[in-house]
Protein backbone atom coordinates (compact mmCIF):
# COMPACT_ATOMS: atom_id res chain seq x y z
CA UNK A 1 0.00 0.00 0.00
CA UNK A 2 2.90 2.34 0.76
CA UNK A 3 4.34 2.01 -2.75
CA UNK A 4 0.90 2.49 -4.31
CA UNK A 5 0.43 5.67 -2.27
CA UNK A 6 3.79 7.04 -3.43
CA UNK A 7 2.92 6.29 -7.06
CA UNK A 8 -0.49 7.95 -6.78
CA UNK A 9 0.97 11.07 -5.15
CA UNK A 10 3.87 11.05 -7.62
CA UNK A 11 1.44 11.37 -10.53
CA UNK A 12 1.01 15.00 -9.51
CA UNK A 13 4.70 15.59 -10.30
CA UNK A 14 4.30 13.96 -13.71
CA UNK A 15 1.17 15.97 -14.53
CA UNK A 16 2.94 19.19 -13.55
CA UNK A 17 4.91 19.00 -16.81
CA UNK A 18 1.61 19.76 -18.57
CA UNK A 19 0.91 22.83 -16.41
CA UNK A 20 0.39 25.79 -18.77
CA UNK A 21 -1.91 27.87 -16.55
CA UNK A 22 0.36 30.86 -17.23
CA UNK A 23 -0.94 31.02 -20.82
CA UNK A 24 -4.48 31.60 -19.64
CA UNK A 25 -3.38 34.05 -16.94
CA UNK A 26 -1.40 36.01 -19.52
CA UNK A 27 -4.34 36.08 -21.93
CA UNK A 28 -6.71 36.82 -19.02
CA UNK A 29 -8.91 33.82 -19.85
CA UNK A 30 -10.37 33.79 -16.35
CA UNK A 31 -13.80 32.67 -17.54
CA UNK A 32 -12.28 29.50 -18.97
CA UNK A 33 -10.16 28.91 -15.84
CA UNK A 34 -13.22 29.22 -13.59
CA UNK A 35 -15.40 26.98 -15.77
CA UNK A 36 -12.71 24.32 -16.07
CA UNK A 37 -12.08 24.30 -12.31
CA UNK A 38 -15.79 23.98 -11.50
CA UNK A 39 -16.25 21.04 -13.90
CA UNK A 40 -13.16 19.18 -12.64
CA UNK A 41 -14.05 19.77 -8.98
CA UNK A 42 -17.61 18.53 -9.48
CA UNK A 43 -16.37 15.37 -11.22
CA UNK A 44 -13.68 14.73 -8.57
CA UNK A 45 -16.19 15.31 -5.76
CA UNK A 46 -18.60 12.78 -7.30
CA UNK A 47 -15.78 10.24 -7.65
CA UNK A 48 -14.68 10.82 -4.04
CA UNK A 49 -18.21 10.13 -2.83
CA UNK A 50 -18.32 6.89 -4.84
CA UNK A 51 -14.83 5.49 -4.15
CA UNK A 52 -13.75 6.98 -0.78
CA UNK A 53 -15.95 5.62 2.00
CA UNK A 54 -13.60 4.66 4.86
CA UNK A 55 -10.20 5.72 6.19
CA UNK A 56 -8.68 2.68 4.43
CA UNK A 57 -9.47 4.29 1.07
CA UNK A 58 -6.61 6.78 1.35
CA UNK A 59 -4.88 5.41 -1.78
CA UNK A 60 -8.04 6.01 -3.82
CA UNK A 61 -8.22 9.51 -2.33
CA UNK A 62 -4.60 10.23 -3.32
CA UNK A 63 -5.18 8.87 -6.84
CA UNK A 64 -8.34 10.94 -7.38
CA UNK A 65 -6.60 14.07 -6.06
CA UNK A 66 -3.71 13.62 -8.51
CA UNK A 67 -6.09 12.83 -11.39
CA UNK A 68 -8.12 15.96 -10.63
CA UNK A 69 -4.93 18.03 -10.87
CA UNK A 70 -3.95 16.23 -14.06
CA UNK A 71 -7.43 16.75 -15.49
CA UNK A 72 -7.02 20.52 -15.18
CA UNK A 73 -3.69 20.42 -17.01
CA UNK A 74 -4.92 18.07 -19.77
CA UNK A 75 -7.93 20.31 -20.40
CA UNK A 76 -5.52 23.26 -20.65
CA UNK A 77 -3.35 21.58 -23.29
CA UNK A 78 -6.36 20.52 -25.39
CA UNK A 79 -7.94 23.98 -25.18
CA UNK A 80 -4.62 25.75 -25.89
CA UNK A 81 -4.37 24.07 -29.32
CA UNK A 82 -7.00 26.57 -30.49
CA UNK A 83 -4.53 29.40 -29.78
CA UNK A 84 -1.05 27.86 -29.96
CA UNK A 85 0.57 25.47 -32.42
CA UNK A 86 2.69 22.97 -30.48
CA UNK A 87 5.82 21.80 -32.29
CA UNK A 88 9.22 20.25 -31.55
CA UNK A 89 10.86 21.78 -34.64
CA UNK A 90 13.23 24.80 -34.51
CA UNK A 91 12.87 25.31 -30.78
CA UNK A 92 15.18 27.99 -29.34
CA UNK A 93 15.54 26.59 -25.85
CA UNK A 94 18.89 28.11 -24.89
CA UNK A 95 17.64 31.68 -24.45
CA UNK A 96 14.98 30.49 -21.99
CA UNK A 97 17.27 28.41 -19.77
CA UNK A 98 18.64 31.26 -17.63
CA UNK A 99 15.28 32.86 -16.70
CA UNK A 100 13.72 29.43 -16.13
CA UNK A 101 16.54 28.38 -13.79
CA UNK A 102 16.28 31.70 -11.95
CA UNK A 103 12.51 31.47 -11.50
CA UNK A 104 12.88 27.81 -10.48
CA UNK A 105 15.36 28.95 -7.81
CA UNK A 106 12.84 31.48 -6.49
CA UNK A 107 10.09 28.85 -6.37
CA UNK A 108 12.45 26.34 -4.72
CA UNK A 109 13.48 28.79 -1.99
CA UNK A 110 9.87 29.87 -1.45
CA UNK A 111 8.76 26.24 -1.13
CA UNK A 112 11.45 25.51 1.45
CA UNK A 113 10.53 28.68 3.33
CA UNK A 114 6.81 27.84 3.35
CA UNK A 115 7.29 24.19 4.40
CA UNK A 116 10.01 24.64 6.99
CA UNK A 117 7.58 25.70 9.74
CA UNK A 118 5.77 22.35 9.80
CA UNK A 119 9.06 20.44 9.51
CA UNK A 120 10.68 22.22 12.46
CA UNK A 121 7.45 22.18 14.47
CA UNK A 122 7.16 18.40 14.13
CA UNK A 123 10.81 18.03 15.20
CA UNK A 124 10.81 20.50 18.10
CA UNK A 125 7.26 20.20 19.44
CA UNK A 126 4.30 17.81 19.71
CA UNK A 127 1.86 16.29 17.22
CA UNK A 128 -0.89 18.39 18.79
CA UNK A 129 1.03 21.58 18.01
CA UNK A 130 1.45 20.45 14.39
CA UNK A 131 -2.30 19.83 14.19
CA UNK A 132 -3.20 23.24 15.63
CA UNK A 133 -0.78 24.95 13.25
CA UNK A 134 -2.01 23.01 10.20
CA UNK A 135 -5.66 23.88 10.84
CA UNK A 136 -4.82 27.53 11.46
CA UNK A 137 -2.74 27.69 8.29
CA UNK A 138 -5.52 26.02 6.29
CA UNK A 139 -8.03 28.62 7.53
CA UNK A 140 -5.82 31.63 6.84
CA UNK A 141 -4.85 30.26 3.41
CA UNK A 142 -8.50 30.49 2.34
CA UNK A 143 -8.34 34.26 2.83
CA UNK A 144 -4.85 34.52 1.30
CA UNK A 145 -6.03 32.67 -1.81
CA UNK A 146 -8.76 35.27 -2.28
CA UNK A 147 -6.19 38.08 -1.95
CA UNK A 148 -3.69 36.50 -4.36
CA UNK A 149 -6.48 35.89 -6.89
CA UNK A 150 -7.15 39.64 -6.93
CA UNK A 151 -3.51 40.62 -7.51
CA UNK A 152 -2.83 37.82 -10.04
CA UNK A 153 -5.09 39.45 -12.63
CA UNK A 154 -2.90 42.57 -12.62
CA UNK A 155 0.39 40.91 -13.66
CA UNK A 156 -0.23 40.60 -17.45
CA UNK A 157 -1.40 44.20 -17.73
CA UNK A 158 1.32 45.55 -15.45
CA UNK A 159 3.97 43.80 -17.57
CA UNK A 160 2.50 45.19 -20.80
CA UNK A 161 2.04 48.76 -19.61
CA UNK A 162 5.45 48.92 -17.92
CA UNK A 163 7.05 48.37 -21.33
CA UNK A 164 4.59 50.46 -23.36
CA UNK A 165 2.69 53.06 -21.31
CA UNK A 166 4.25 54.05 -17.99
CA UNK A 167 1.41 56.45 -17.10
CA UNK A 168 -1.17 53.66 -17.34
CA UNK A 169 1.19 51.38 -15.38
CA UNK A 170 1.30 53.85 -12.48
CA UNK A 171 -2.51 54.21 -12.51
CA UNK A 172 -2.91 50.43 -12.50
CA UNK A 173 -0.57 50.10 -9.50
CA UNK A 174 -2.62 52.68 -7.61
CA UNK A 175 -5.87 50.93 -8.55
CA UNK A 176 -4.53 47.56 -7.41
CA UNK A 177 -3.51 49.07 -4.07
CA UNK A 178 -6.96 50.60 -3.59
CA UNK A 179 -8.68 47.27 -4.32
CA UNK A 180 -6.40 45.51 -1.82
CA UNK A 181 -7.16 48.14 0.83
CA UNK A 182 -10.86 47.58 0.26
CA UNK A 183 -10.61 43.81 0.75
CA UNK A 184 -7.50 42.84 2.72
CA UNK A 185 -7.91 45.06 5.78
CA UNK A 186 -11.48 43.99 6.73
CA UNK A 187 -10.70 40.34 5.98
CA UNK A 188 -7.70 40.35 8.33
CA UNK A 189 -9.55 42.15 11.13
CA UNK A 190 -12.74 40.15 10.63
CA UNK A 191 -10.91 36.81 10.82
CA UNK A 192 -9.05 38.01 13.93
CA UNK A 193 -12.32 38.85 15.71
CA UNK A 194 -14.19 35.67 14.74
CA UNK A 195 -11.29 33.19 14.94
CA UNK A 196 -12.28 31.52 18.22
CA UNK A 197 -15.89 31.02 17.15
CA UNK A 198 -14.95 29.80 13.67
CA UNK A 199 -12.54 27.21 15.09
CA UNK A 200 -15.12 25.73 17.47
CA UNK A 201 -17.77 25.64 14.74
CA UNK A 202 -15.51 24.16 12.05
CA UNK A 203 -13.14 21.92 13.98
CA UNK A 204 -14.70 21.33 17.42
CA UNK A 205 -13.84 22.20 21.02
CA UNK A 206 -10.69 20.06 20.99
CA UNK A 207 -9.06 22.52 18.57
CA UNK A 208 -9.73 25.63 20.68
CA UNK A 209 -5.98 26.60 20.84
CA UNK A 210 -6.09 27.01 17.04
CA UNK A 211 -8.08 30.23 17.57
CA UNK A 212 -5.09 32.00 19.12
CA UNK A 213 -2.83 30.65 16.37
CA UNK A 214 -5.16 32.04 13.68
CA UNK A 215 -5.17 35.44 15.39
CA UNK A 216 -1.36 35.50 15.36
CA UNK A 217 -1.43 34.56 11.66
CA UNK A 218 -3.78 37.41 10.70
CA UNK A 219 -0.93 39.93 10.13
CA UNK A 220 0.25 37.59 7.35
CA UNK A 221 -2.95 38.43 5.45
CA UNK A 222 -1.88 42.09 5.41
CA UNK A 223 1.81 41.42 4.77
CA UNK A 224 1.31 38.85 2.00
CA UNK A 225 -1.74 40.60 0.56
CA UNK A 226 0.00 43.93 -0.01
CA UNK A 227 3.40 42.30 -0.57
CA UNK A 228 2.05 40.25 -3.47
CA UNK A 229 1.30 43.44 -5.42
CA UNK A 230 3.98 45.83 -4.16
CA UNK A 231 6.80 43.27 -4.21
CA UNK A 232 6.19 40.16 -6.31
CA UNK A 233 3.88 41.47 -9.05
CA UNK A 234 5.88 44.69 -9.32
CA UNK A 235 9.21 42.84 -9.47
CA UNK A 236 8.11 40.50 -12.27
CA UNK A 237 6.36 43.17 -14.34
CA UNK A 238 9.32 45.58 -14.12
CA UNK A 239 11.98 42.92 -14.90
CA UNK A 240 13.41 43.18 -11.36
CA UNK A 241 12.64 39.61 -10.34
CA UNK A 242 16.30 39.02 -9.37
CA UNK A 243 15.55 40.75 -6.04
CA UNK A 244 13.13 37.93 -5.14
CA UNK A 245 15.75 35.17 -4.86
CA UNK A 246 17.91 36.83 -2.17
CA UNK A 247 14.68 37.96 -0.51
CA UNK A 248 13.45 34.37 -0.27
CA UNK A 249 16.88 33.24 0.97
CA UNK A 250 16.88 35.90 3.71
CA UNK A 251 13.34 34.91 4.73
CA UNK A 252 14.38 31.25 4.97
CA UNK A 253 17.42 32.04 7.14
CA UNK A 254 15.42 34.29 9.48
CA UNK A 255 12.67 31.69 9.66
CA UNK A 256 15.03 28.86 10.63
CA UNK A 257 16.75 30.95 13.33
CA UNK A 258 13.54 32.33 14.87
CA UNK A 259 11.79 28.95 14.67
CA UNK A 260 14.63 27.24 16.52
CA UNK A 261 14.31 29.84 19.31
CA UNK A 262 10.54 30.33 19.52
CA UNK A 263 9.08 26.85 18.86
CA UNK A 264 10.54 25.29 22.06
CA UNK A 265 9.05 28.22 24.01
CA UNK A 266 5.66 28.77 22.36
CA UNK A 267 5.07 25.65 20.19
CA UNK A 268 2.82 26.41 17.17
CA UNK A 269 2.44 30.06 18.15
CA UNK A 270 6.21 30.44 18.09
CA UNK A 271 6.24 29.12 14.51
CA UNK A 272 3.62 31.71 13.56
CA UNK A 273 5.59 34.56 15.13
CA UNK A 274 8.68 33.38 13.23
CA UNK A 275 6.74 33.37 9.95
CA UNK A 276 5.38 36.87 10.54
CA UNK A 277 8.84 38.22 11.38
CA UNK A 278 10.55 36.65 8.36
CA UNK A 279 7.74 37.56 5.94
CA UNK A 280 7.67 41.15 7.17
CA UNK A 281 11.46 41.51 6.92
CA UNK A 282 11.78 40.21 3.36
CA UNK A 283 8.78 42.22 2.13
CA UNK A 284 10.14 45.44 3.64
CA UNK A 285 13.53 44.86 1.96
CA UNK A 286 11.94 44.17 -1.43
CA UNK A 287 9.45 47.03 -1.08
CA UNK A 288 12.14 49.62 -0.25
CA UNK A 289 14.38 48.43 -3.10
CA UNK A 290 11.59 48.50 -5.70
CA UNK A 291 10.15 51.79 -4.43
CA UNK A 292 13.54 53.45 -4.85
CA UNK A 293 13.97 52.02 -8.35
CA UNK A 294 10.41 52.55 -9.66
CA UNK A 295 8.98 55.96 -8.79
CA UNK A 296 5.30 55.08 -8.62
CA UNK A 297 2.79 56.97 -6.47
CA UNK A 298 0.03 55.40 -4.40
CA UNK A 299 -2.80 57.34 -2.79
CA UNK A 300 -3.29 56.63 0.92
CA UNK A 301 -6.92 57.78 0.88
CA UNK A 302 -8.25 54.26 0.23
CA UNK A 303 -6.21 52.91 3.16
CA UNK A 304 -7.54 55.60 5.54
CA UNK A 305 -11.15 54.97 4.46
CA UNK A 306 -10.70 51.22 4.81
CA UNK A 307 -9.18 51.52 8.29
CA UNK A 308 -11.97 53.80 9.51
CA UNK A 309 -14.71 51.59 8.02
CA UNK A 310 -13.04 48.51 9.50
CA UNK A 311 -13.01 50.11 12.96
CA UNK A 312 -16.78 50.68 12.75
CA UNK A 313 -17.27 47.12 11.47
CA UNK A 314 -15.13 45.76 14.32
CA UNK A 315 -17.20 47.63 16.92
CA UNK A 316 -20.40 46.09 15.53
CA UNK A 317 -18.88 42.58 15.42
CA UNK A 318 -17.64 42.90 19.02
CA UNK A 319 -21.12 43.97 20.12
CA UNK A 320 -22.64 40.87 18.50
CA UNK A 321 -20.01 38.64 20.14
CA UNK A 322 -20.98 40.00 23.58
CA UNK A 323 -24.64 39.05 22.99
CA UNK A 324 -23.75 35.36 23.63
CA UNK A 325 -25.96 34.05 20.84
CA UNK A 326 -25.82 30.42 19.61
CA UNK A 327 -22.49 29.92 17.86
CA UNK A 328 -23.71 29.40 14.28
CA UNK A 329 -26.22 32.27 14.55
CA UNK A 330 -23.62 34.62 16.04
CA UNK A 331 -21.03 33.85 13.37
CA UNK A 332 -23.57 34.28 10.56
CA UNK A 333 -24.69 37.63 12.00
CA UNK A 334 -21.13 38.84 12.52
CA UNK A 335 -20.16 38.07 8.93
CA UNK A 336 -23.33 39.37 7.27
CA UNK A 337 -23.99 42.45 9.41
CA UNK A 338 -20.29 43.29 9.77
CA UNK A 339 -19.78 43.01 6.01
CA UNK A 340 -22.86 45.13 5.30
CA UNK A 341 -21.74 47.83 7.75
CA UNK A 342 -18.29 47.91 6.15
CA UNK A 343 -19.71 48.35 2.64
CA UNK A 344 -22.21 51.00 3.78
CA UNK A 345 -19.46 52.95 5.53
CA UNK A 346 -17.34 52.95 2.37
CA UNK A 347 -20.32 54.07 0.30
CA UNK A 348 -21.08 56.86 2.77
CA UNK A 349 -17.43 57.95 2.74
CA UNK A 350 -17.47 57.86 -1.09
CA UNK A 351 -14.74 55.30 -1.57
CA UNK A 352 -13.81 55.87 -5.21
CA UNK A 353 -12.82 52.31 -6.13
CA UNK A 354 -15.98 50.84 -4.55
CA UNK A 355 -18.11 53.41 -6.39
CA UNK A 356 -16.48 52.40 -9.69
CA UNK A 357 -17.10 48.72 -9.02
CA UNK A 358 -20.75 49.27 -8.05
CA UNK A 359 -21.31 51.47 -11.12
CA UNK A 360 -19.96 48.73 -13.41
CA UNK A 361 -22.12 46.07 -11.75
CA UNK A 362 -25.27 48.22 -11.98
CA UNK A 363 -24.55 49.15 -15.59
CA UNK A 364 -24.03 45.50 -16.52
CA UNK A 365 -27.24 44.53 -14.70
CA UNK A 366 -29.25 47.27 -16.42
CA UNK A 367 -27.86 46.28 -19.83
CA UNK A 368 -28.80 42.65 -19.25
CA UNK A 369 -32.28 43.68 -18.08
CA UNK A 370 -32.85 45.80 -21.19
CA UNK A 371 -31.64 42.98 -23.48
CA UNK A 372 -34.10 40.56 -21.90
Each language-model region and where it sits:
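Membrane-proximal transmembrane or re-entrant/amphipathic helices at the cytosolic face
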Residues: 318-372
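Helix-loop junctions and terminal segments of transmembrane helices
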Residues: 140-184, 231-237
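Alpha-helical transmembrane segments of polytopic membrane transporters and translocases
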Residues: 102, 117-119, 131-148, 176-179, ...
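Alpha-helical transmembrane segments of multi-pass membrane transport and lipid-handling proteins
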Residues: 1, 8, 171-225, 253-264, ...
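Membrane-interface helix-capping segments at transmembrane helix termini in multi-pass transporters
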Residues: 1-14, 54-61, 201-214, 323-333
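Short runs within selected transmembrane alpha-helices of multi-pass transporters and secretion channels
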Residues: 8-25, 36-44, 61-77, 106, ...
